[in-house]
Amino acid sequence: MPEIVDGYTHVLTERFFEDLTDKFGFQGLSGRPEFLWDHEQRKQDMVDYGVDKQIITLALPTMFQGMDHDLALDITRLANDEIRRLADEHPDEFIPVGTIPKVSGEFLAEFDRCVDELDMAGVQIFSNIDGRPLDDDQFWPLFERAEATDTPLWMHPQLWEWYDWASEYMEHRLFGWPFDTTLALSRLVFGGVMEEYPDLEIVSHHGGGMVPFYGRRIEMFYEQRMSYPENYQGYHEHAAELSQPAEEYFKKFNADTAVSGSTPAIDCAASFFNEGNVIFGTDYPFSPERGRQTIDYTIDAVDRMNADDETKADVFAGNLYDLID
């Protein structure tokens, strides 16, 4: 049995939840999501399915949407302290990743604290920040810091303003989150971020969204607009000048395997991004059976990949270690 490191899981601590609701008066969460801080059950689930370690990230990114700057900063500091504390209490099981939900001087300082003081393996950002795309000028200092410090960024999808009815069946998360992930990755490429910071490491959740499936469409779309600039004048006013074909920048991204146990989706991601950029991740504990199903199904899906045993072992653990070591 190869070593298995789950590269994208979500967690809260009870202390964080209590402070969030009592100290900070935040009322944006319904009920008490105790399954997110049942750490003993989490460790038992790991044992039962042979998972050796987990990357732990802050759950429920939607709490930050539209949140006041000062409140968000206080909550972010608390969250990162709690993630670090949890990893210190369970060093054999948990690898901590911080979270930066907004970008400003204070949040950039918090990024530095995550890297320099808290010794996080990486930092989680969101696919849009208060509705602003990731290639917005105000976010470039974060990418500059991340590249300079060799700090991988875990990118979690975030909600956005769209149709009011999209939330009725939760399509805004079912399909909206992979779509927003796709938008974010495309903005990083076409906005010139990946051109400026070629060594920037991004871990995209849920298999890289639509990017692997539409890889050839991405390239053809870009080539069409480059070949006939007179027909797409608005495009050229916004798109960055790229020194390589657009597809080459997309292939630099990493993608996790949190696609609900779909081997074809994982094979598609491995074919597009290349197998060295695919990282085992389950989205635990968000599945039936409080996360056990997603562990079970995702391990099985990787086992059934169209790849040799060495490649599968890299997906299960080696690729992540290459990223964070």
Write out the residue ranges for each language-model feature.
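Mid-to-C-terminal alpha-helical segments outside catalytic/metal-binding sites
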Residues: 2-7, 11-53, 81-88, 109-113, ...
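Short glycine-enriched loops at secondary-structure junctions
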Residues: 10-11, 102, 157-161, 285-287
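Short aromatic-enriched loop/helix-cap "lid" or pocket-rim segments at secondary-structure transitions
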Residues: 15-20, 67, 110, 165-168, ...
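Divalent metal-dependent hydrolysis catalytic cores, especially in the metallo-beta-lactamase
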Residues: 27-67, 93-99, 121-125
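Aromatic- and glycine-enriched glycan-recognition loops and surfaces
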Residues: 32-40, 77, 81, 132-143
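Short, well-ordered beta-to-alpha junction loops that form the rim of enzyme active sites
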Residues: 57-60, 99-101, 156-158, 205-208, ...
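Surface-exposed, active-site-proximal loop segments in enzymatic domains
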Residues: 59-73, 105-106, 167-171
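Catalytic pocket-lining loop regions of alpha/beta-barrel enzymes
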Residues: 87, 117-277
